[in-house]
């Protein structure tokens, strides 16, 4: 997934 440590919120569902 394309995630940053500072943007985990939108990432949680993208992983």
Curated annotation (Swiss-Prot):
Role, per record: Plant non-specific lipid-transfer proteins transfer phospholipids as well as galactolipids across membranes. May play a role in wax or cutin deposition in the cell walls of expanding epidermal cells and certain secretory tissues.
UniProt-recorded Gene Ontology molecular function terms: lipid binding
The entry's keywords: Allergen, Lipid-binding, Transport
Record carries keyword Ligase: no
Protein species of origin: Solanum lycopersicum
Family stated for the protein in its record: Belongs to the plant LTP family.
Keyword Transport: yes
Protein name: Non-specific lipid-transfer protein
